[in-house]
């Protein structure tokens, strides 16, 4: 059994598809894959994922990096993930109708100074995506009206579509946002963040000198394809990470 770990949100967003496609792929020729025809998935934060890789509890993981990365672990970049600002149509009409589609903001860029009164959800403060957001907020000398903090970006989108609060969304969650919009008349609007050029990087994590099995190679290829799909999707919608979303 192939042991794969990632963070809770990423597990919910992409692991079901990866697990199903993986099992369909290796099931074509069972004898070549031995007992690694199925995946055992693990959820943990980045620090504990790194510990589990180092101790041999996981064959591989994908997440961000931390300063506590063990010396016997290697990493490879999979995805430069963008962070976006999300607000419902109802809340946009209430707080900033000038940002509605077709008006002056044709580039879909949100200046967070314009949204300081809007209630917002934030993720956990130790996450890299919140650190790069705070860098922008510090540069603007502005604080947000935070009404909810948790590590669940999919929950934040559900709160946003119910007009509880605006929120922030990583590129991996855009497909979930689009599914929400398909079922709701109160559409969620997505904006790039003015002054934010840093990305949230996702890495493949493995132990140094780890020997790949055939099944592991299949999963890594599928994971790389999925991350490439996410990168193309966010770039097609909002431009590449090399495009400047506007200075401060």
Regions found by a protein language model. Give the residues of each.
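Central regulatory/effector-binding core of bacterial HTH transcription factors
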Residues: 1-69, 150
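Acidic, Gly/Pro-rich loop/turn segments at junctions of secondary structure
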Residues: 45-114
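Secondary-structure junction motif
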Residues: 95, 103-140, 171, 212-216, ...
């Amino acid at each position: 059994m192939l042991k794969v770990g990632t963070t809770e949100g990423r597990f919910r967003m992409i692991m079901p598809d990866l697990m199903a496609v993986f099992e369909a792929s290796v099931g074509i020729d069972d004898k070549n894959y031995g007992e690694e025809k199925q995946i055992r998935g693990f959820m943990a934060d980045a620090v504990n994922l790194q510990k589990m890789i180092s101790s041999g509890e996981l064959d591989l993981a994908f997440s961000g990096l931390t300063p506590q990365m063990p010396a016997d672990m290697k990493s490879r970049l999979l995805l430069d993930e963008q962070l976006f600002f999300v607000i419902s149509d109802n809340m946009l009409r209430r707080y900033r109708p000038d940002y509605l589609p077709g008006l002056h903001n044709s580039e879909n860029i949100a200046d967070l100074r314009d949204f300081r009164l809007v209630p917002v959800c934030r993720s956990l403060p130790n996450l890299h995506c919140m650190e790069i957001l705070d860098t922008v907020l510090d540069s603007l000398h502005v604080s947000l009206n935070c009404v909810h903090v948790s590590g669940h970006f999919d929950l934040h989108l559900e709160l946003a579509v119910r007009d509880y609060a605006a929120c922030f969304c990583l590129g991996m969650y855009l497909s979930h946002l689009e599914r929400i919009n398909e079922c709701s008349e109160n559409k969620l609007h997505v904006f790039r963040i003015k002054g934010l050029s840093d990305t949230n990087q996702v890495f493949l994590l493995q132990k140094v000198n780890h020997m790949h099995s055939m099944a592991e190679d299949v999963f890594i290829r599928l994971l790389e394809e999925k991350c490439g799909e996410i990168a193309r999707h966010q770039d097609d919608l909002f431009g590449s990470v090399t495009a400047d979303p506007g200075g401060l």
